[in-house]
Amino acid sequence: GARQDSLIDIGQQVGFSLEPAADSLKMADSYYQNCGQLEAIHQKLVEQLRANGLLDIYQRIELPLTKVLAAMELNGIKVDQAWLAGLAGEWQTKLAELTQKIYQQAGQDFNINSPKQLQVVLFDDLKLVSKGLSKTKSGPSTDAANLQKLQQQHPIIELIIEYRELSKLLNTYALSLPKLINRDDGRLHANFQQAITATGRLSASEPNLQNIPTKTEIGKKLRQAFITDPGCQLISFDYSQIELRIMASLANEQGMIADFVAGQDIHLATAAKINDIPLDQVSDQQRRAAKAVNFGLLYGQGPHGLAEATGLSYGAAKDFIDQYFVVYPRIAEYMNEAVDQARRLGFAATVWGRRRYLPDLDSPNQAIRRAAERMAINLPIQGTAADIMKAAMIAVDDWLADNFDQRQARLILQIHDEILIEAASEKVDKIIAAVPKLMTDVIDLAVSLAVSTKTGFNWAEL
């Protein structure tokens, strides 16, 4: 799904022979010769974009976005280094306590980080039942999905899950982030990549802040470390259920469109329709199942996945999905049409024409072919969401530049369906009044987009 090419690779793809420097003495001459061909390579690439109907998205989205991302990288995000250091110490102590509790439950000391040793402890020593678990060459896997299934069998499982989450946050963030903080401004300056993922979504590195948990208490504690300059606030603008709105629009599913237009809780409305009951009689379990189906279908989830996500039996999960397609028949038709079109064209495309080529749609291997079919269904939805987000970032950045100087308001992060702005407190109201409309106006869909807004003095408050 991801690829990075060097100038030499790109030149060779369009018929130019560029040579790497053989040694340091020839490096300057090699760079000079290669750079001399940049304009010709550029023209060839533009011709390819035009021939494939991609020139518009390049000129309207990807090219202007480079300026936005460069500014975001320079802006960075402020870090409370004292809080982070305190958190690291607290978590190291907590991790040591968890380690001892796990040893007590196991009746022995062992390397908790070793899947093989953990496998022996759980299934050989503690005799946990492995039926229904995914397997590795050496036996039942101890991955996160299997641990969730084992939770009811032994109290050690919950401790291991907590240990793993805490260990990851400690090592990936609390202990590693201080090494990446710029000493001059006390800020983290991540790298943003706009052309790495196959769907067009942005990715980030050094650090990647997209994987910090949002709902767990320890994840929220870590987010408290991300703060603002004095006199400023963070403002979050988050697209609400953007992929479901795109799916309803692409499928022209009138039932779902009507629920969105009416401002209904879409998961509640889905559960009510599937179970044929009034909205006020929907249980939490029924809403959870509806939510799992609504989002799961975007990624090709079937009855087995729904059963795992909700605790339903396989039969009940299958019935739920079958009834879902009765309630929303155009969703099923859209999924079939998306696969058929991608197979006919050789690629899936977003609303604005971004392509993902899918040669595996014709694979004789069923598993590989099914994976490509899921991509054909998902790319027009997730890829369109990515295009919309990029267009919104450009629109918001332009508006901020027209109305404020860099010290008063600036884009600092884009994560999933959300952008973060750091702004002087006295400018917050003006920004909140303008930005949601900028974000919703970038595209005209059958279902209007919606943006939620939150403010705070650190990331955990959003």
Identify the role of each PLM range.
Residues 218-233, 401-405:
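A short acidic-Thr-Gly-centered motif at the start of a beta-strand
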Residues 27, 49-53, 77-85, 226-234, ...:
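Glycine- and acidic
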Residues 2, 6-18, 23-214, 233, ...:
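Conserved "right-hand" nucleotidyltransferase catalytic core of DNA-directed polymerases
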Residues 74, 182, 189-190, 195-197, ...:
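Conserved catalytic core of nucleic-acid polymerases
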Residues 236, 243-275, 355-369:
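Metal-dependent catalytic core segments for phosphate chemistry
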Residues 119-120, 199, 210-212, 242-245, ...:
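Flexible loop/turn segments at secondary-structure boundaries
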Residues 230, 242, 406-410, 414-442:
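Gly/His-enriched, cation/cofactor- and phosphate-binding structural elements
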